[in-house]
Structure formats: structure tokens, C-alpha cells
Amino acid sequence: MLSDLAKAEALLDEEYNGYGQIYCNNAMAQALHARVALYMQDWVSAINYSTSLIESDKFQLSSVNQTVGSENHFRYLWSNDDGYEIIWRVYLTPESYGGMLGQPFLGYNTDKVYYYPDYVPAQWVLNLYESKDLRDNAYFANAQTGHAHGLVWPLLIKYQGNASIISSYALYEVSMPKPFRLAEQYLIRAEAYCRQERPNYALAAKDLTKLRESRFESGSGTIAMNADNWMTNIANERVRELYMEGHRLQDIKRWGNLYNKGEGFTRTPQSCSLEEGSSLKRTADHYMFVWPIPRHEVEAPGSKVQQNEGY
């Protein structure tokens, strides 16, 4: 994979680097390389690649303290799928809109009156957001559901839908995936600073503070980092920023015993969740953190593939 990334970086023209790009470009390859380096615990490369993007004049964090129309830049990033920090997005149009990212979390298209969510945010996630952290307002809202009980639940509205597609087709829950954003690069570099041979918690704190200042009303959000709290701060900030963008499983898996004292994942029952599955617990070393290889691949003629442990 590293050789493929190197070839991509050499072949993809930097001329097409810029926010909101819909075609593969050099910056996207660098963003992927930074993520891969972090996963491989290559802290130096993770820092170098993320720094290249952070210091580029092509991107900047979408701030809640700047507005476009009636929305702040960060909220606009999600309602219109456009913003200065998007390194690469999967482009959708009213005529070709792909899947519905928001359907499992909202189910509003059912009757366009009430919400019928399959999943609701965990209460511990909602509790992570401080009062001036406007990611809370951009990601979550309380709304009445259309289920028989008619209860008001906290819902994920991050993928409520692209404003253009909603206005053209009255079709909700269609949002453009944004696999690479500048915000992730700050999180990558902050973690790498903490995990390198000689940790630099001051630089890590500077990166997290920079990110948080763009998300907090009036630019507050300063955070301190040290040898005792860095893991908790990194883990929590990745949840606050990247919630439901596909990073969590990989994060818990790669952190192992560093995170939550090796306790892995525990689901806590809450009022709007079903009893089944609400008591799920998986320690960091549980085999189910690695998915099974499809049976047909293991049993194919001539296959030398061995099934993952536990399956």
C-alpha cells in the first residue's frame, strides 16, 4: 500500500489540490498516507504528511464563528456538503444521489412528518460536548419520533441531507461522504506528537486547541495535555469531531490496552434503546474487533487463506 501511495503522490498533480475537490488529487493521497502512517505507528511520517496539509494554503478549518448566509461555516459544511476544510468528497447531484447516509439515524423519508430512527446517539457521546461546543448543535437535535410511543429522542442530524437535493426533490438524508477533512489531520498530528519516542504534549495541545477554537463559540476551547490525560483527550476529541464518520472501530482496535484500561467497548442501556444488545461488552483483546474473512474466500479451490482467530 505504501508503494501505491508513493506512486499516487508522484502522479497526482498538485494543481488540483483545493477545498471541496471531487476528483482524486495529490492532497487526498497525502491525507490517506497520514492516516495509514498513524495506523502503522509511523509517527514521524504521520506528522510530516499531516503537517504538509495543515500548513498548505489550500485548506482551512470551517469555523463556527464565521457565517455564510444564515449558517455558520461548520454547519454549512454538513447542510450543503461544502467547506474550506474538505480535502476530498464523494460528489452527488439531485439526478445521481447515491445512498442515504442519514436514513438509519433519522428515517424521515418514511412519511416526512416524523422521524423513525434505527439508531440513536449514546448518552455518553452527547455528554462529551461542552456548552460552547457548537458541534453539538450541528450534529444532534431532539425531535419527536413517529413510533407508537411518540417520544422525543436525541437524533443524529449530521446527515440530515444536502440542501440542494432537499429543495429539488424533497428528498432528505442524502449527504455527500467526506472521507478526508482537514480536521482529521489535526487529530492525526496531535496523536502522533503524543506517541512518538519523545512525546511533545505541548504541540499536541496546540493542535487540539486550534481545532476546538474553530468549533467553540467565541473561539474558546483551550485544552491542556500531559502524560496522564493525553489518551483520554485524543479519544474524546476524535469522537466529538468524527462521530459516525467510520473511524471508531478502527480506533478502539488500534489503541488496544492504551484506551479505557483495556476495557474496550461497553454499551450502556438508555431510555430510547432496546434491551437486546444494550448490555454489549467487548474487551480490547476480544476477537470480534477483527471481522471474519468471508467463508467462500477461505473455502475457494486452492485458497491458502486462513480464517481469523475465533471464527
What are these regions (language model features)?
Residues 2-103, 128-311:
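Acidic/polar-rich alpha-helix caps and helix-coil junctions
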Residues 99-113:
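Acidic-aromatic pocket-rim loops
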Residues 109-125:
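Short, cationic low-complexity segments
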